[in-house]
Amino acid sequence: MKIVFMGTPAFSVPILKRLIDTHTVLAVVTQPDRPVGRKRLLTPSPVKEEAQKHGIPVLQPEKIREQHEDILAFAPELIVTAAYGQIVPKAVLDAPPYGCINVHASLLPKYRGGAPIHQAIIDGEKQTGISIMYMAEKLDAGAVLSQQAVAITDEDDVQTMHDKLSAVGADLLEKTIVALEQGTIEAVAQDEDKATFAPNIKREQEVLDWQKPARALFNQVRGMRPWPVAYTLVNGNRLKVWEAKEIAGEHECEPGEILATTKQGIDVACGNGTILRLTVVQPAGKKAVLANQLLQGAHPFQVGKRLGEGHE
């Protein structure tokens, strides 16, 4: 099938690769090059880099609405999107004979929006998945063609689920396109009453609230790793928490109070009498290290000190 692909981040690359292997990719539409890193060097998106390896034409409109005719000039039979990053106008959605379909990293109608992987982990979900659906003018609200569930374990974080879901997305997309060509698949409308949302992560969501139970904070740490990384304050300075674990035990201390410092990490009082052990942390301006390495010299993690003081 002749396809135009629209995507931007690393999540989209395995999906693009699969389309290149199995179909004719006429063009790729991706976000413009953006400044990256301390030197703010203009950097192409991962999707653009992959397309250029294969000599595929690349379009990078600042506003797709102002350049949609250039996309339609390729006369695709199908448009596939995966984490593109802009709302696709109706003129584009309606043009291809087979429509415009999207690869979304959740089991719709749950977790519509830009951060479905983060939010599913933060919420403590035991599974999420991939949905292939028709694009609609309303965000992630189109009729669903196919879905596949993927388990979330306590060992998973955003990176591991990102990689699993991207691979599943490529497989499911391939099967879905075959079914579209054969006319053996029907789209099912989403139940709007069951829709939930996962908008892009906001800065305030990065802050660990020690009033919450340890399990919720454990999920938050995983759901913020490797980006943007959850944090707390110690003596007014940020302490990023890369890894933590819920441990057995009870306490009657104030939430955020350091209960113990051991070779295993820093034990912190949480809500409902629960305890979270910080095992990998990153002080401001330094690299992430095992928590016990910070305890070997002078450190601010005295038993009884409260973390998080200074947050508004």
Curated annotation (Swiss-Prot):
This is Methionyl-tRNA formyltransferase. Its EC number is 2.1.2.9. It catalyses: L-methionyl-tRNA(fMet) + (6R)-10-formyltetrahydrofolate = N-formyl-L-methionyl-tRNA(fMet) + (6S)-5,6,7,8-tetrahydrofolate + H(+). Disulfide bonds: none annotated. The keyword Protein biosynthesis applies. Pfam families: Formyl_trans_C, Formyl_trans_N. NCBIfam families: fmt. Attaches a formyl group to the free amino group of methionyl-tRNA(fMet). The formyl group appears to play a dual role in the initiator identity of N-formylmethionyl-tRNA by promoting its recognition by IF2 and preventing the misappropriation of this tRNA by the elongation apparatus. Keywords: Protein biosynthesis, Transferase. (6S)-5,6,7,8-tetrahydrofolate binds at residues 106-109. GO terms for cellular component: cytosol. Belongs to the Fmt family. GO terms for molecular function: methionyl-tRNA formyltransferase activity. The lineage of its organism: Bacteria, Bacillati, Bacillota, Bacilli, Bacillales. PANTHER family: METHIONYL-TRNA FORMYLTRANSFERASE, METHIONYL-TRNA FORMYLTRANSFERASE, MITOCHONDRIAL.
